[in-house]
Each structure stands twice: as structure tokens, then as C-alpha cells.
Amino acid sequence: MNNSIVTYETFHGSAKKIAEVISDKLNCKCINIDTPFEAEDLKEINNIILVFNFRGPYTAQLTKLYLNRVKEQLKTKNVILVGEGLFSEKEFPVVAEEIYKNNPSKTFTKFFVNGQLRMDTLFPEERVLLKKFSELTGMEIKDMGELDLNKAEEIASEIENLIDTEEFKSIKDVETSENLEEKGTKWVCSICGYTHYGDNPPEKCPLCGVPKEQFKEQ
């Protein structure tokens, strides 16, 4: 599927391993984030798959800076984010808001590959964050052992099926903020910052999955 490209961060080697599994499955190019998109021909690319390791504030900030750098290239693409490790309560809103802000009319999908985690090495405040994360996502928080490349294979297959759907095949015009605002009341997810326009909030947030009660009218 050469209408996709996989890009990964270089701070953690596990992100590269996952990216290679996905690109092999999709038969598409795999580049690291130090390779500028400007050097790639993206005209025929519909789907950009981002692979990042999430272990702390540094990688969250790295992701945000990278997404801001490539925001023009993301505007007309479907974005798939594969996170290895765990998001913290502080990290996920940073990433989700950045993607949605720059990509409001295209599809955004997220997957997780459980990575290395040792519960007995965590600080108390980190345990609190993980508990909140577990409640929000339904992911069980436990010692994870080594990088789960079998899970990466499963996700690669899910992505392969996903990008073959009509929703991902169709290229829509990017809607401006003005056009979105004409659609009604502005609702903002209090957890991840996703913005929805309409008479009512969505039943659940398409980014972080929380119920509509978490949306605030603005």
C-alpha cells in the first residue's frame, strides 16, 4: 500500500522496531522524524502513520514539536498515531489537541503497543497518573515486560484493514474554522481538547473515548 508512509521518533529504539513491522505489513516507506517531509513526494500519500514512544514529558513535547513542524503536510492526510508505552494524563491532551487542531476534517486513529513498564520503579505521582489513564482508556496497567512485537503485528493488520475502508480512501477538502463554526455550538472535551461543533456534543470523544458528559460548551 504505497499510499501510506510510516514515520517514527528516534529517541527510543523500540519505536523504530514497531514502525518497521507496520511498514513491512503495508509495503510502504518508513522514515524517521529527522527526515523532513519536504524531501518526500507526498502527493500520492493518503495516510501518515506516526510511531512514538511515550515514557514522559520529553517525548510528549517532542511529539508536539514534530506535529507542529509537519502540520501543513498533515492537513489533507489521514493520521494514525501508534503510541508505544503509556501516555500520562499530561501527555495525551498535548498530542491529541495538536493533531486535531491541524487536521480537523480528516480521520485520526490511535493505537497502543504495550511496552516496557516496571510498576515497582514508579514514583507515587506516576502511579496516580497511570491509574487515571487506566480509568480513561480501560487499559489494564501492569508490568509489561519486553516490547510486544506480536501486538505490533496485530496493529499492523488492523491498520491495513482500516485504510482499505471508504472513510480512509476518500480525500475530503479541509474545512476552515469559519465553516466549522457555522455548524453550531462549540463543544470541547475537557480531557483531550477535541473540539466538536453542533447542537449537542458527540456521544463519546472520538480521540480519547470519554462520554459526552466530559464535553464543555464554549
Task: Describe the residue ranges of each PLM region.
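Residues immediately within or flanking Cys/His clusters that coordinate Zn2+
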Residues: 186, 202
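FMN-binding flavodoxin-like domain, especially the glycine-rich phosphate-binding loop
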Residues: 25-29, 47, 56-181, 187
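Short Cys/His-rich micro-motifs in 6-15 aa windows
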Residues: 208-218
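A short beta-strand-loop structural module common to alpha/beta enzyme folds
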Residues: 28-42, 50-52
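N-terminal beta1-alpha1 ligand-phosphate binding loop
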Residues: 2-25
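Cys/His-coordinated zinc-binding microdomains
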Residues: 193-196, 209
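Short, cysteine/histidine-rich loop/knuckle motifs that typically chelate Zn2+
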Residues: 190-191, 205-207
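Short beta-strand/turn micro-motifs composed of small residues
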Residues: 7-8, 52, 83-85
